[in-house]
């Protein structure tokens, strides 16, 4: 974007950047999906929106790569400011099942909470993320519940936080090992283990602690369908 003069910043203002080698694009997957109209949903649109709404929560969305023979895939969804990650396992994933994931999340936490907590989603051009209307609009109200933006093709570093989480998830889901034997309950347990791990950048607090502090305990328990001990 600097090279193409989309931004006022020039390369001479970025002394570290000129030392970097040009990034090679990974073309293992074809995420171009040229038949999809992403007008107003591009990465440049995302930058423009965030310039106008700098304090907006931005969640990053991705699928963790699995072996080709698997019928199941793991969806990872992260809120970087508190390192809060929601993961789910989806059999034979497609765009409708991704929409179902967000519909179910909205049903759990309520439309008002969804709009406040998840105003912006940034993802790649995976074919499963192409139902823009289904993701962005509430099945309950028919109104817009979030904004969805796509990274440029083959530029995974535009959503670095979810890429980093995917690396951490490899501790639970090693490359080359099938996940088809895992259930939703297995994934929930691993998700909670990840969220209960202290993180240095959170002053050695856990993502669960950070999320509860910023967004409240009730919202956390609604997301994971867990009974709050204080409410028993």
What is each residue range found by the language model?
Residues 1-164, 168-178, 182-183, 189-192, ...:
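Secondary-structure boundary/capping micro-motif
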């Amino acid at each position: 974007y600097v090279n193409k003069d989309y931004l006022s910043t020039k390369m001479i203002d970025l002394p570290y950047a000129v030392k970097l080698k040009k990034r090679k694009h990974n073309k293992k997957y074809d995420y171009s999906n040229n038949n999809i109209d992403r007008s107003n949903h591009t990465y440049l649109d995302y930058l423009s929106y965030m310039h106008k709404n700098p304090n907006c929560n931005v969640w990053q969305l991705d699928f963790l790569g699995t072996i080709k023979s698997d019928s199941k895939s793991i969806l990872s969804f992260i809120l970087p400011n508190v390192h809060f990650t929601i993961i789910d396992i989806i059999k034979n994933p497609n765009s409708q099942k991704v929409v179902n994931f967000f519909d179910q999340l909205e049903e759990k936490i309520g439309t008002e909470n969804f709009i406040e907590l998840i105003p912006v989603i940034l993802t790649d051009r995976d074919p499963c993320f192409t139902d823009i209307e289904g993701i962005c609009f509430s099945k309950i109200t028919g109104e817009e519940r979030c904004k969805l933006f796509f990274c440029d093709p083959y530029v995974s570093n535009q959503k670095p936080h979810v890429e980093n989480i995917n690396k951490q998830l490899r501790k639970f889901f090693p490359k080359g090992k099938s996940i088809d034997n895992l259930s939703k309950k297995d994934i929930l347990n691993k998700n909670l283990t990840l969220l209960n791990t202290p993180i240095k950048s959170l002053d050695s607090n856990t993502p669960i602690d950070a999320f509860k502090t910023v967004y409240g305990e009730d919202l956390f328990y609604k997301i994971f369908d867990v009974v709050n001990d204080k409410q028993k």
